[in-house]
């Protein structure tokens, strides 16, 4: 397993929480339009937006990058497998690696997990003590 894949590894409970948050995003959007948005809705919306912004997808131009992020989001929102999404501009394995990275960023921005940068700082701090 490569270092990039290990970097975005989430435990099963965290994966379920993040997928449920993204899966319920359509309901959150309806509440927002109706003016009944909760604080958690705002936090979840911001976390999803930040995750989309954090996705690097090296080798893609901006249009292809936005398309790929849209497909990743659609896959999680509607629980659709790669095979049902149509044109994704990448192979199945790479798509699921990107999807895992997206879930990691959502969890990180919601505060469910500690970010990689913060985690490495904590390790460095412990090493110096």
Language-model-detected regions and their locations in the chain:
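DNA major-groove recognition helices of helix-turn-helix
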Residues: 95-109, 113
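Helix-turn-helix DNA-binding module
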Residues: 78-91
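Generic recognition of cysteine residues
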Residues: 58, 90-91, 103
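Short, aromatic/basic-enriched loop-to-helix "N-cap" motif that marks the start
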Residues: 5-8, 88-92
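Short amphipathic alpha helix immediately N-terminal
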Residues: 60-80
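N-terminal interaction/assembly modules
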Residues: 1-62, 114-129
């Amino acid at each position: 397993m490569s270092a990039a894949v290990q970097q975005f590894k989430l435990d099963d409970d965290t994966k379920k929480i993040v997928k449920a948050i993204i899966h319920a995003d359509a309901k959150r959007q309806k509440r927002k339009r109706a003016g009944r948005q909760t604080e958690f809705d705002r936090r979840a919306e911001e976390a999803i937006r930040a995750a989309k912004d954090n996705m690097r997808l090296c080798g893609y131009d901006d249009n292809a990058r936005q398309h790929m992020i849209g497909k990743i989001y659609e896959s999680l929102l509607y629980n659709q497998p790669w095979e049902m999404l149509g044109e994704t501009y990448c192979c199945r394995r790479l798509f699921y690696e990107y999807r895992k990275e997206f879930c990691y960023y959502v969890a990180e921005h919601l505060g469910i997990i500690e970010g990689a940068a913060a985690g490495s700082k904590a390790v460095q701090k412990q090493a110096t003590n």
